[in-house]
Amino acid sequence: MSVRRTRKDDGSQWTVADSRSVYGIRHWGAGYFAINEAGRVEVRPNGPQSAPIDLFEQVDELRQSGLSLPLLVRFPDILQDRVRQLTGAFDANIARLEYQSQYTALYPIKVNQQEAVVENIIATQNVSIGLEAGSKPELLAVLALAPKGGTIVCNGYKDREFIRLALMGQKLGHNVFIVIEKESEVALVIEEAAELKVKPQVGLRVRLSSLASSKWADTGGEKSKFGLSAAQLLSVVQRFRDAGLDQGIRLLHFHMGSQIANLADYQHGFKEAIRYYGELRALGLPVDHIDVGGGLGVDYDGTHSRNASSINYDMDDYAGVVVGMLKEFCDAQGLPHPHIFSESGRSLTAHHAMLVIQVTDVEKHNDDVPTIENKEALPETVQWLVDLLGPTDIEMVTETYWRATHYMGDVAAQYADGKLSLGEKALAEQCYFAVCRRLHNSLKARQRSHRQVLDELNDKLADKYICNFSVFQSLPDTWAIGQVLPIIPLHRLDEEPMRRAVLQDLTCDSDGKINQYVDEQSIETSMPVHAVKEGEDYLLGVFLVGAYQEILGDMHNLFGDTDSVNIYQNADGSVYHAGIETHDTIEDMLRYVHLSPEELMTHYRDKVASAKITARERTQYLDALRLGLTRSSYLSS
C-alpha cells in the first residue's frame, strides 16, 4: 500500500483511507467518485459496481491531445444512471404501496441546456422521461429534441407566440401541458386554441403558503414569482369553463423551492398542495396529473443533514413521501391516483460534471524569522513578540495566541502613528506568524477549549493558491449564493496534506475566490492541500458542478468558456472522448462586447508605426499582438 513518508500524531502512517476521510469523498461522491490505492481520484460513471476511470490519467491524456486547463469534464453515463435511480425509486414505491398510476421524471432544461445533457437524459432506456421548458428558446429546443409522443410541460411567462408554439407541439404529436402561471395567459390560450382548432391540455400552478427553508425558498411560498392564489385559481377555472375548455384542465403544478434540505419541510408543503388536487376534482375538473415541481436536493457537503448544502434524505425517502402521501389522501377522499411528475433537474445533473483547475502560484505568510542581533534595540512591542517565539506550556497555548494577536494590534497602531519603521513592522509580522504556526501545531481539534483558536489560525495561516480559472465563469453559485462544492486534489492522496489553502481565481476582483470547503464532516474556510513541488502541475477537481453552473457563468474580466469534453465508458470498461469543445479565444470574448479584433489590429498597426522602435521590433510586436488575439483568455497551462 502506498503511504505517506511521515507519520501522523498517533504514530501511524498516512494512507489513502485518511484522505478519503479528510475530503469526505465517500459521503458526497454518491458512489461515483472515490480515491484509489495509488492516491488518485477515480470515477465510476455507471455506479459503484462499474469499472473505475483514473481521472488524473484521463486529464493527462486529454492535455497531451491538445486540450488545456481549466477543463470541464462531463460524464454523460452518470446522467443516465441518475435517471434510472430516480425513476427506480418512484417505481419501487409505487409497487410497494400499490399506487394505481405511474411516474414520469421531467427534466427542466434550464438546469443545463447542453445538447449532450438533454439528449443523454431522454435517451435513457426503459424509463418514463419528459422535458420542461420555461422560455421560448427552451420550448423550441424541446420540441425538436423530445421524441414523438413525449411529455413536454411549459412553465414560465408566456406570450401569444409561446402558446402558439406549444399548441403546435401538441398537434405534432407531443403530450404538451401549458401551465397557467398568470391569469393573463388564459385569454391567449383560449384564442390560440380556437385559431389552431386544438383542445389544449392545461395545467394550473398554485402558489402555496408553505415555505421550505433553503437558499431558494422565495421560489415557493406566497412571495413566489409564479403561481395562482386561491381566488385567482377559481377565476381561471371559471374562464376556461365559460370557453368550454375546462375539461382540458389535466394537471396541478406547484413548486416549493430548489434544494430542500429537510424532508419534513417538503412533507408540510405537500400536505397543502394535495388539498388543491381534491378541490379541483370536486369542481368537476378531470385533473389526473400532479407535477410536484423541484426540491429534490443534492448532498454537496456529504453531511446528510439540514445544512443548505446538504439533504437529510435520499431519493427513495423522497419518492416514498410523494407516493405515500398522495395515496393516503386519495384513498381517504375516494379519488383516483394521479400520474406523478417531478422536476428534479439538480439531482439528475449535478454529479455528471467536474472542473479541473491547476495551481499556478502559491502565496504563503513569511514566518521565517531572521537572526536578531540586538533585541533590546527593538521597540518594546516587537520585543514582546520576539519573546513569544520561545517554548510555550501546553496549558498556555490559547493565552499565548491572544497575547500575540493583541501585540500585533499595537504594532499596526504604532506603525500608523509613525512610531515603527517598515523594517520593524515586517519583523513583527514574521514573529507573529512564526508564533501562530508553532501554536497551530500544538492545538488539538478534539479539545473544545482549542477549537476557536484553531479555527482562527486555520484562516490566518492558510496559503493562497492562485488557480487558473474564473469563479464567475465556472462556479458562479459559489460567489452569488455561497454554494458549497466539494474540492479535492486529483493526485498525491497517498500523502498527507500538510498545508491549508484558500483558492483564488485569475479575475481582478476580490470576490474571485472560494470561501467554503468540505472538510471531513464540516464546512471550513480553507481546505487541506499538499505543498506544491517545484515544476509540478498540482491539479484540483471541483465536483458536482453539472447543475446551473455552466449556463449561469458570466464573462467577468472577459474570461470565457473553458475547454470541455464528454467522457463515455464502454461496456468493457474502456473509455472514449466525444463532444470536445475548445475554449473561447480572446478574440471571441472581445467580439461579445462588440470590440472588433480587426479594428483593434488597425489601431495596433497605427501605434506600432508611430512608435520609436526598429523595423524588426515592429514586426515582432504586431506578430505578438495578432497571436495574442487567438489565445485562450486563461493562462497557458
Curated annotation (Swiss-Prot):
Q: So which domain of life are we looking at?
A: Bacteria
Q: Which GO terms describe its biological process?
A: arginine catabolic process; putrescine biosynthetic process from arginine; spermidine biosynthetic process
Q: Name one GO molecular function term.
A: arginine decarboxylase activity
Q: Which reaction does it catalyse?
A: L-arginine + H(+) = agmatine + CO2
Q: Which residues carry this modification: N6-(pyridoxal phosphate)lysine?
A: 110
UniProt-listed PROSITE patterns: ODR_DC_2_2 (PS00879)
Task: List positions binding substrate.
Answer: 290-300
- Write down the required cofactor(s): Mg(2+); pyridoxal 5'-phosphate
* Family, per entry: Belongs to the Orn/Lys/Arg decarboxylase class-II family. SpeA subfamily.
The record, for HAMAP family, names: SpeA
Record-given protein name: Biosynthetic arginine decarboxylase
